[in-house]
Amino acid sequence: MSEHAAAASKRPDEYVPWREFLTSGYTASLALVSLGVWLHAADSLVVATMLPAMIADIGGAAFVSWTVSIYEIGSIVAGAASALITMRYGLRGPMSIAAFLFGAGCAASAISPNMGLLLIGRALQGFGGGGLVAMCFVALGVLFPRRYAARALAVVSAFWGMSAFLGPLIGGLFVEYANWRLGFWFFAMLSFMLSAWIALRQETATLEQGKIGTRFPLSRLALLCLAVVLISYGGVRVEALRTSALIGAGVLCLIWFFRRDGLAGPDRLLPHAPLDPRHATGATLLMLMMLPMATVAITAYGPLLMTVVHGTSALTAGYVVACSSIGWTLAAVSVSGSPERFDRIWIAIGMAVTTLSIAGFVYAVPAGPVWLIAVCALAEGGGFGLAYTFILRRITAVAPEEDMQRITGAIPTMQRIGYALGAAYIGIIANASGFLSIQTPDDAGTVARILFLACLPLAVVGLVAMLGLVRRHPYDASL
């Protein structure tokens, strides 16, 4: 047995030193997965930074919100289909195509003379990026021994966290010293290089033996697409009747999608009982949908509320919100070597800390001081980092073998569905609490208090769902 194989075959409940992990022979696979995730994470922030220059050049200000929404729609739909695609065709081909689609979308945006072609490019970026990230999570569960899964996910989390800083920096540099079109060409070049790298790597072919001969579920994907479009559009311009109707219709479509998918047998896109907390897989996905729903308020409304209530600059408010990414990265890197027998504890502590951070926002955002808001943001991200690092390893240990790729691919997809639902939900709450009629810091403080209080029930549902993942399982007796 080789040295690398011997290390990987050690008991997964032993501590994993960074030195062992980084010299284990999985470095190239780790770099590939990390780059795929970073491209997807950084792209949105780069585009947000370049957006004013893009609008000044090609116009289309009325469609600004759709540059984000259409990307998210593509990401969610492609992410949902990724598990089934990898089960049929393996990892190498689909991942390479997803990276190529992402690059093609960037190229289309780079040459766009108007907003129409740019939106087509954003749709391609969404389909490519969403599929790429979901397949990267499948790769984490398949290409790495479970002993190394937490370390691998910690590195991916670090790259995701770095995107919070490097994304706006890259976008700003292109706008300041070149032009926004070169920014898209930069990402296109990286994507095409990644596509070629994936296609030429033999190790990623290890999944190509699990093919299944099923029809591709276009009707279910169309239903999911419709659900996300309705929910996203409902949150773009918040009006009580219009928004409630659109989001209600979107949620009904989402429920219909889940029901139809559950009856599809081996053709399922998602694992069995995807939102049933009585099953470990359902508990995991429900938790990963509800907690992002509960935490999106600080990103969406935090900067504006801080500038009104506390008079902070936009830059300071942005750094406060970025503390969430810092907390996530630091926590993930710090604890990822923990033995597997502590996974349940870290998941429970992490999600509890995230929930407590929301309670902290209820006080800190309206009352201050600003450093306390930053501490709460650090705790929110840190809680996610503590838990998220071990969720993949935990669920791959207790989930049914036939659902392994479905659950790993569904993790980022359900997160994005949660963010979409959460953005629409807090949009309604903000509108109902007087956000549009804010005139004084006291008014803004009242809105902030209501917003974060309304997020607490969502977090509690996520905590209850978490119990289905961390409760004792027969597998735990082997640790």
Features from the language model and the residues they span:
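Cytosolic juxtamembrane N-terminal segment immediately preceding the first transmembrane helix
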Residues: 1-42
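Hydrophobic alpha-helical transmembrane segments
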Residues: 12-18, 44, 69-71, 98-106, ...
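Hydrophobic transmembrane-helix bundles of small-molecule transporters
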Residues: 176-286
